[in-house]
């Protein structure tokens, strides 16, 4: 296990956002945590002891001046049953810049040092309470912006990914040990024993029938369920003045974009978010696509094209009260490579085009929704349609989905490729030594998911994303 420099000292940090509020928390972890608390905290009532995992009322006082700073609640937690597996103290005081920083100064003066970003969680990892995939899940929980994202992050925090990776790793270790036995003891084994440990078909069956499908399925599931973790991007595209901005405002439930009767009001991409079945939807209102934009509008259209290329879903918005035009054709052509829905807006006005005309022009299987962005029931129908058509599958899988982050997916992908190379070597009669090397590579990649490979630079990069106090 990697050991971080300074892990035997005592660290402290403000664990809550600094500002005016009801409660602020200062966290202390390390061998001197409880001793520091005893020197600063005067318990109310007749008692003086601080039992583990109990909360005590009292006052923080400067031991030098005797000045009382704040009325607090102090909790002490003895190792190893703590977040870091070290002695931990949490001082719950009033939240204000002056009081939090003054108490922190006293804790530092009594011998603690200021924690680095993520150092409490890093100590939890280094002390074996969590693996690296769980440590990374902490930041996922903090940054979750949707219910589904939170549920997935919580699943990782509870160790679901680490459990799978450890089982794959054990399977690899067993295969590799048999191969090493074949290599090391080939001259010492009789023919029957040698056949038993070096049966190539058995190795291939184990890889093809168990390990390779398991990793492949995990990666495929992660890709299918990506929307649950990362959300989806929904781009509103169309020619000018078809009601894209009105639709954006209706979807997010507030006046986010400027709406006027004049074409070309939206000159740049306007972005906001809303939740759909617990999934974060990032909706982008884009500049209208037309043949003769002015110079400023051209920049907005360039960004529109980029947004379309990156979109998960496109709503191709058309004005039902106006005849189809070459500009509508250009919009459909621009979005044809992405999952899209034609939204016939302004259904509250006399129609100039029909769904039949749309299908005749753009194809029988083109999905179409006729709505008015000004009517809430219509917008709700559109939400339901998007939910059923694009989000139903990931939501059905959400109960068991384990979605690793980008780094973890990269490690699993590399492990899978190494297993495939090992399989091909074994089935093709290649050298056992080369197959063993590939299996070792696969195991090292899985070790990286768990943080078992002693990579300090990797740990520094991961924990630098954390806030101080976590």
From Swiss-Prot:
Keywords: Cytoplasm, GTP-binding, Hydrolase, Magnesium, Metal-binding, Nucleotide-binding, Potassium, tRNA processing. It is an enzyme of class 3 (hydrolase). Disulfide bonds: none annotated. The keyword Calcium does not apply. CDD domains: trmE (cd04164), TrmE_N (cd14858). Homodimer. Heterotetramer of two MnmE and two MnmG subunits. Exhibits a very high intrinsic GTPase hydrolysis rate. Involved in the addition of a carboxymethylaminomethyl (cmnm) group at the wobble position (U34) of certain tRNAs, forming tRNA-cmnm(5)s(2)U34. This is tRNA modification GTPase MnmE.
